[in-house]
Amino acid sequence: MRRDVPQDSVRRNEQIRAREVRLIGAEGEQLGIISRNDAIALAKEKGLDLVEVAATADPPVCRVMDYGKYKYEQQKKKQEAKKRQTVVQIKEIKVRPKTDEHDYQTKLKHVRRFLEEGDRCKVTVFFRGREIVHKDRGLTILDRFVEDTKDLAKLDQEARAEGRTLQMMLAPIPKK
């Protein structure tokens, strides 16, 4: 198999293999089916390139255009799409069953900020020593987080015990 053209690029000028092509002019007008060599000559006359637009068509559809400009516009579109793409992160807040009110409010403020930024938030209650006997206190704290963030988040994953911890996941409610 010949490898004249890298897989991600389009064929242009002499790289086009077909003998005849359906030609589209620089302004988008149909010029009909002509030989590849005539099409290349026509493009060179105008100082432009012959670019294969639809290789699978019979005969292939080619367009007279400035390949450098075309490539630049494609790159810009790709960058723009990448910019619009958001990466959702999982932030974690750790609390203890004996967390005091002020500390709870600080942690709650952090959770609310994470959710407003569009990140998922994992709330973990970790137990030390004999505290594990009082799992109900941990569940109470997790329920309180759910109640205090119900305007911003929905419960994504119910509270579950894992070793010496209780964990739950909050996901932001999508903005409309």
Curated annotation (Swiss-Prot):
Coarsely, its chief localization is cytoplasm
SUPFAM superfamilies given in the database record: Translation initiation factor IF3, C-terminal domain (SSF55200), Translation initiation factor IF3, N-terminal domain (SSF54364)
- Task performed by this protein: IF-3 binds to the 30S ribosomal subunit and shifts the equilibrium between 70S ribosomes and their 50S and 30S subunits in favor of the free subunits, thus enhancing the availability of 30S subunits on which protein synthesis initiation begins.
**Keywords per UniProt:** Cytoplasm, Initiation factor, Protein biosynthesis
* UniProt xrefs under Gene3D superfamilies: Translation initiation factor 3 (IF-3), C-terminal domain, Translation initiation factor 3 (IF-3), N-terminal domain
| UniProt-listed InterPro entries | T_IF-3_C_sf, T_IF-3_N_sf, Translation_initiation_fac3_CS, Translation_initiation_fac_3, Translation_initiation_fac_3_C, Translation_initiation_fac_3_N
Query: Which gene holds the coding sequence for this protein?
Result: infC
Q: Name the family the entry cites.
A: Belongs to the IF-3 family.
How is the quaternary structure described?
Answer: Monomer.
Name recorded for this polypeptide: Translation initiation factor IF-3
Top-level taxon in the UniProt lineage: Bacteria
Does this UniProt record's set of keywords contain Protein biosynthesis?
A: yes
Q: Looking at the UniProt record for this protein, which Gene Ontology cellular component terms does it annotate, in alphabetical order? A: cytosol; membrane
Single GO MF descriptor: ribosome binding
- Tell me the compartments it is located in: Cytoplasm
Q: Which organism is it from?
A: Nitratidesulfovibrio vulgaris (strain ATCC 29579 / DSM 644 / CCUG 34227 / NCIMB 8303 / VKM B-1760 / Hildenborough) (Desulfovibrio vulgaris)
Record has Plastid as a keyword: no
Offer one example of a GO biological process linked to this entry: ribosome disassembly
